[in-house]
A protein has these predicted regions:
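A generic structural micro-environment signature
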Residues: 31, 43, 61, 87, ...
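Glycine-rich loops and low-complexity Gly/Arg-rich segments
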Residues: 47-49, 92, 102-107, 129-130, ...
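Acyl-donor binding region in acyl/amide transferases
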Residues: 83-151, 171, 254-317
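A conserved beta-strand-loop-helix scaffold within acyl/acetyltransferase catalytic domains
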Residues: 4-7, 14-73, 78-90, 135-270, ...
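Short intrinsically disordered coil segments
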Residues: 96, 169-176, 335-341
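Low-complexity, flexible helical/coil segments
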Residues: 59-61, 81, 101-106, 113-118, ...
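Active-site/acyl-donor-binding loops of N-acyltransferases
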Residues: 2-17, 65, 83, 142-166, ...
């Protein structure tokens, strides 16, 4: 059995039930973490040990979780975080880096309030720049000190109906016809995690990220994801003759298939390569008995992407990120207008950088982004 590393209680908080202690655990070493995930309906792949281990291997983040459960007791709740120590973006706790969402694994509102109170004290004592949480629901009821900093759109497709019904809910012109076009054009499909599949996927990802004028994530990140998730991760490639035209990375967790990364060669987009990959993913998920296809988050200003996902018949919901700061008052509010000039300058530089340079920049920068 792996060694369990316990630290002193992170904090003591006053609540209606008296003084309560909040503890720190290592979710990668404490076997109670997997037991908590198995019992929690809110657990997702972003809570999993595989995701945490990939973050640790790639970026060197220290993973921890806050809980009101004492050592030796069953784990009743948990809030996982990664510690990011960056000279570029500051010292902060994030739950969790590069995750679309990460709901607090807490059933009782009182426990959540106590945990958030302890986090506020931690933020003040240790002078974290901020503590960020990415729940599926609002945290306003847990504390008056949390502030919303960014809003996204999340899409999820219900896979419980039969395939014919699911297909019938796709937008006729934008989705159904594109899938049929891909079939008529003779696009072929390949899946796996072999070296050739990996390299074709990464090449498509780099091309796409450059088109969007942002660096790609490091190669090592995708290799570690594949290693940590094993057979639950699939890379899917659409081919036109001898040319890879679209790629997608999906991860299966429990009854959900999650679309996490994708890329395409723009000169072949009219052939419907990405549409073919989405459709094959849905078919595979149905065959495996999965119930949900998580299409991931979209930025608020990505109107085209939001429309695209909605046309698959996916349900749309609001996703809000929250932060605590040492003062409890000031917070780095997400405001696109404030950062416009920085974003514009950076994207201009990225658009001119050769693919090799852009890839190197991604390897350097993503550790600081979190």
């Amino acid at each position: 059995m792996p060694e369990i590393l316990y630290q002193e209680p992170a904090a003591e908080v006053e609540s209606g039930r008296g003084v309560r202690r909040v503890y720190l655990i290592d979710p990668l070493k404490d076997p109670r973490w997997e037991d908590l995930l198995a019992r929690s309906p809110s657990a997702s792949l972003f809570h999993s040990a595989a995701w945490l281990e990939a973050l640790r291997r790639t970026y060197g983040y220290a993973c921890t979780a806050y809980t009101t459960s004492a050592p030796g007791e069953p784990l009743e709740n948990g809030l996982p975080f990664c510690r990011i120590q960056s000279w570029l973006t500051g010292r902060r706790l994030v739950s969790l880096p590069f995750s679309d969402h990460c709901a607090p694994l807490v059933e009782k509102n009182g426990d959540l309030r106590d945990l958030v109170s302890a986090l506020q004290e931690e933020c003040r004592k240790k002078r974290w720049r901020y503590i960020e949480m990415r729940p599926l629901e609002s945290l306003e009821a847990a504390s008056q000190l949390v502030r919303s900093v960014a809003t996204y759109t999340l899409h999820r497709l219900d896979l419980r109906p039969d395939l014919e019904t699911i297909f019938g809910r796709f937008h006729r012109d934008s989705i159904q016809r594109k899938i049929r076009r891909a079939e008529r054009e003779g696009l072929t499909y390949e899946e796996g995690t072999s070296e050739s599949i990996f390299e074709n996927f990464y090449r498509l990802l780099v091309v796409t990220r450059r088109r969007h004028r942002v660096p790609p994530q490091p190669r090592e990140w995708f290799r570690n994801l594949a290693d940590c998730f094993g057979d639950a991760l699939k890379i899917r490639i659409a081919w036109h003759r001898n040319q890879p035209v679209a790629g997608m990375l999906t991860i299966r967790y429990r009854e959900t298939l999650v679309y996490k990364y994708g890329g395409s060669d723009a000169q072949f987009n009219n052939l419907g390569g990405m549409h073919l990959l989405y459709w094959r993913s849905i078919q595979d998920a149905k065959e495996s008995g999965l119930r949900v296809f998580d299409l991931g988050r979209s930025d608020a200003d990505q109107a085209g992407l939001i429309t695209f996902k909605s046309r698959w018949g996916a349900a749309q919901s609001k996703l809000t990120y929250w932060r605590l700061t040492p003062s409890g008052n000031s917070v780095h509010i997400f405001d696109p207008a404030v950062r416009t000039w920085r974003t514009r300058v950076a994207k201009k530089l990225f658009s001119r950088a050769p693919a090799r340079v852009l890839t190197a920049l991604g390897t350097i920068l993503y550790k600081h982004i979190g």
